[in-house]
Amino acid sequence: MKASKIREMTNQELHNELKKLKNELFNLRFQLATNQLENPMRIREVKRTIARIKTILRERELEQEKANKNAK
């Protein structure tokens, strides 16, 4: 998933997507351990998407803190 598409999502949607991706990563790792994984690149893609989502959530959190600090 591209960062530009992730940025269009709301925080609630991002949290839901993050939960879904973490569950998918768990299942992919389980498949890898049992030698049933067809596409090992999917693990990398999911991990990177999780990182992108966490980064964007953190950016928004910092923007919120900065706005609150400037408002005082």
UniProtKB/Swiss-Prot annotation:
GO terms for cellular component: cytosolic large ribosomal subunit. InterPro entries: Ribosomal_protein_uL29 (IPR050063), Ribosomal_uL29 (IPR001854), Ribosomal_uL29_CS (IPR018254), Ribosomal_uL29_sf (IPR036049). GO terms for biological process: translation. It comes from the Bacteria. Keywords: Ribonucleoprotein, Ribosomal protein. Gene3D superfamilies: 1.10.287.310. One of its GO terms (molecular function) is structural constituent of ribosome. Disulfide bonds: none annotated. Pfam families: Ribosomal_L29. Transmembrane segments: none annotated. This is Large ribosomal subunit protein uL29. It comes from Caldicellulosiruptor saccharolyticus (strain ATCC 43494 / DSM 8903 / Tp8T 6331). The gene is rpmC.
